[in-house]
Amino acid sequence: MLYTIKHRVSGAVLFSLGCGSFKLCVEAAVKSGADLRDANLGGACLRGADLGGAYLGGADLRGADLR
């Protein structure tokens, strides 16, 4: 399935990837060095995701599962 991470205000595509889950898409974005400032990650299930090194300034993380 194709997952897309979009800018929270403009809706511009920041990163997209065909993979098994949105969590894997976010991890791949972080690993590739994608700029995730102002990303719309609200409500995402990111439980156990490796976000080390990610810059998420201004990102919408409301309701995201980050445990």
Language-model segment annotations:
Residues 1-60, 65-67:
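Extended, small-residue-rich solenoid/repeat segments and analogous flexible loops
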